[in-house]
């Protein structure tokens, strides 16, 4: 029997509007900050921050899986860009039959 080793990774995903896309939420926040006396704030952009854990055989496999998640659901790639960081959260775990 073979033993399969897996690793759990923690993903921090940052989704932001593309620079060419207007950001009405950012404009509203910037205006609100100005009304509160923060006149030195400019270029406010609002985005999304997502955290999740994924189990994979390798770091490359985890990266590919998170990349697909972002492309398919977590980001609207027509108007948003994304980037992510992955860090291991557990020691690798062996699964399967052992002799």
Region locations from a protein language model:
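Long, contiguous binding/interaction regions
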Residues: 1-99
């Amino acid at each position: 029997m073979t033993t399969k080793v897996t690793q759990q990774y923690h993903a921090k995903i940052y989704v932001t509007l593309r620079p060419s896309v207007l950001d009405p939420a950012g404009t509203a926040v910037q205006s609100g900050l100005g009304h509160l006396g923060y006149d030195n704030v400019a270029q406010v952009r609002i985005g999304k921050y997502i955290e999740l854990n994924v189990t994979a055989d390798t770091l490359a496999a985890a990266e590919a899986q998170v990349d697909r998640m972002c492309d398919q659901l977590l980001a609207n790639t027509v108007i948003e860009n994304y980037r992510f960081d992955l860090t291991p959260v557990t020691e690798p775990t062996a699964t399967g039959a052992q002799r």
